[in-house]
Amino acid sequence: MAEITAKLVKELREKSGAGVMDAKKALVETDGDLDKAIELLREKGMAKAAKKADRVAAEGLTGVYVDGNVAAVIEVNAETDFVAKNDQFVTLVNETAKVIAEGRPSNNEEALALTMPSGETLEQAFVTATATIGEKISFRRFALVEKTDEQHFGAYQHNGGRIGVITVVEGGDDALAKQVSMHVAAMKPTVLSYTELDAQFVHDELAQLNHKIEQDNESRAMVNKPALPFLKYGSKAQLTDEVIAQAEEDIKAELAAEGKPEKIWDKIVPGKMDRFMLDNTKVDQEYTLLAQVYIMDDSKTVEAYLESVNAKAVAFVRFEVGEGIEKASNDFEAEVAATMAAALEK
């Protein structure tokens, strides 16, 4: 039987990522054949990964990588936040983001077939990681964003990598693009412009806003405060030319009723129209980047601020770890019972 030296164990660990005992056992089982030991560890890793396949992995990290005029944002999941801080896990995330940015796959199937620095496919690398780390490690999603030579990427990660953002800005510079990405990370817009909002979605969100106003008015009535008006509109998409023209006419009629001289209306109407637009685009302000108040200058929307510096936002992607994943709530008694049952089966 071949001698299993510490040097051989170390070499296998470096190539496979396996622990000391697993590496030594694999070498013993394969009579010191390094290649066979690697294959054996891979097979065992696939078996371990299969056992963990039905677990919920809702923690993890985002990865962001820029490759020239292409940027990738990815999400990789683990079962616990503790593992998400593991050096091996962090390296896997960073390598995956780089491989995807450079490989430019069109879907997850193509992404999983890409070759990692280890020589494994991306899919195999995640099986290996699941086996060596001891938790289900899964590649969840990615997005690729492209720009022209004249445009700028803003790459930003927040909260230790739990949020990853790429923004494309035309005009300005990389620093401005990064500031916009910081805004996106903080304010959670879902689309760039109101033109991307579904009409039914706007209708439903407006109903929710008015329901909240109704509840607020009940509280206000109890302390003899005047009721707040309900909102007629929620998005710029609903503000047709006719609606805007009627709003302006209503404002002028109000000024006339108040006895304001007509010669000063031109100074008053624009401000009141701005207020009308602000009050009737609440859904846009919640969900669209361009309509949100800019965190770097709260006197302007993102769109207005960028216009003031001869720039505009073209696109963005924002990933937050665990979005849309339902985390399992463990029943402690059931967990203990399952552990005991598993022990009895052995």
Curated annotation (Swiss-Prot):
PROSITE patterns: EF_TS_1 (PS01126), EF_TS_2 (PS01127)
Keyword Cytoplasm: yes
InterPro entries assigned: EF-Ts_dimer_sf, Transl_elong_EFTs/EF1B, Transl_elong_EFTs/EF1B_dimer, Transl_elong_Ts_CS, UBA-like_sf
SUPFAM superfamilies documented for this protein: Elongation factor Ts (EF-Ts), dimerisation domain (SSF54713), UBA-like (SSF46934)
GO MF annotation: an example: translation elongation factor activity
Protein's cellular compartments: Cytoplasm
Keyword set includes Cytoplasm: yes
Gene3D superfamilies (UniProt xref): 1.10.286.20, DNA helicase RuvA subunit, C-terminal domain (1.10.8.10), Elongation factor Ts, dimerisation domain (3.30.479.20)
Pfam families according to UniProt: EF_TS (PF00889)
Involved in Mg(2+) ion dislocation from EF-Tu as annotated region, ranges: 80-83
GO cellular component annotations of the record: cytoplasm
UniProt cross-references to CDD domains, sorted A to Z: UBA_EF-Ts
Record keywords: Cytoplasm, Elongation factor, Protein biosynthesis
Known role: Associates with the EF-Tu.GDP complex and induces the exchange of GDP to GTP. It remains bound to the aminoacyl-tRNA.EF-Tu.GTP complex up to the GTP hydrolysis stage on the ribosome.
UniProt similarity note: Belongs to the EF-Ts family.
HAMAP family per the UniProt record, alphabetical: EF_Ts
UniProt name for this protein: Elongation factor Ts
